[in-house]
UniProtKB/Swiss-Prot annotation:
Keyword ATP-binding among record annotations: no
The protein's enzyme class: transferase
Gene3D superfamilies per record: Aspartate Aminotransferase, domain 1, Type I PLP-dependent aspartate aminotransferase-like (Major domain)
Family: Belongs to the SHMT family.
Catalytic activities: (6R)-5,10-methylene-5,6,7,8-tetrahydrofolate + glycine + H2O = (6S)-5,6,7,8-tetrahydrofolate + L-serine
Alphabetical UniProt keywords: Amino-acid biosynthesis, Cytoplasm, One-carbon metabolism, Pyridoxal phosphate, Transferase
Chain positions recorded as (6S)-5,6,7,8-tetrahydrofolate binding sites: 121, 125-127, 246, 355-357
Species whose genome carries this gene: Streptococcus sanguinis (strain SK36)
EC numbers on record: 2.1.2.1
Example of a GO MF term: pyridoxal phosphate binding
Entry protein name: Serine hydroxymethyltransferase
Amino acid sequence: MIFDQEDYKAFDPEIWEAVAKEEERQQHNIELIASENVVSKAVMAAQGSILTNKYAEGYPGRRYYGGTDVVDVIEGLAIERAKEIFGAKFANVQPHSGSQANCAAYMALIEPGDTVMGMDLSAGGHLTHGASVSFSGQTYNFVSYSVDPETELLDFDAILQQAKEVQPKLIVAGASAYSHIIDFSKFREIADAVGAKLMVDMAHIAGLVAAGLHPSPVPYADITTTTTHKTLRGPRGGLILTNDEELAKKINSAIFPGIQGGPLEHVVAAKAVAFKEVLDPAFKVYAQQILDNAQAMAQVFRQHDKFRVISDGTENHLFLVDVTKVVENGKVAQNLLDEVNITLNKNSIPYETLSPFKTSGIRIGTAAIAARGFGVTESIKVAELIIKALENAENEAVLNQVRAEVRELTDAFPLYEGLN
């Protein structure tokens, strides 16, 4: 019987070997992708639990199937913990992803064809903030705002002027590659000035907001969305918050039955566990380490003339570096660093001149290395190794030395033991 197949190594060696290789890769690679993190064993255990068997269309107390008393309790805990973390009156923990959370938020706030302002992708925005290849750009009339070409920071006077010209029904704040504090109160003022709603996508900074290290958008936004991974250090998934009861009803309807069927209750349970971790005082210590590491790394790059840190620094968990004085483009840098077991991603920079498949920059994030235990000393070392590798792209002896030093760091800070 299939129920006897407890040992998936014996039952499906191909998958087991692939997972083992990924475990090995994560153990011996330095992870700097800003949207990735390292979850606890408790989060993984909840996500791998028997809850994966249960279908539960609807919401706690209002399900379409029977046998949901237990999952009602679990989802209720996730909701209450999310509300406590962010000081919100209402929370929907069912979105399968941040993109689906954003989709539901749009459905609750606007109609197809409505004009929306969102951050330009090359300035740091996200695909779901109006990119033409995304459902957002195909369903709504998005007009992009950017950053100041000199400072590479948000220019609220320019955004206000643009909003007065285009008269959006909705303004979307938040980013996936913007390294400074976002003043949500100013976005609220702009939205009010033109009679628009305000939605904030805080997917990248949610953990910093939860720790009190970045201003919260929840008091200002009509709807706030986020992922539950990234700096929140939970399972991959989405979350929607609001203080408006009528919007909460629209959000719930947009998620189910609007764009999703049954929630992934095993993931909801993992979200609940992660939220409990966030409520622990130790999480703020972790979040502060994220910031300290990012600022230390950015400073290393700022001290090298061949590298340019976009907007001259960082106030959150990430920063961008223009690498075109050292290597051809960001893709080349990403691939080269992959070869020395440092993982990050190519990234467009403001007013980008290269294609998104090449880019002028790379994006560096510190959430995963902070979770692993790296402090400022190790983070500075990682930045130096990146520079060393990129400046010696054709020197195999130097690259071998970098690989060896990466291995020393990863061996000193192991991820997990005995998972596979």
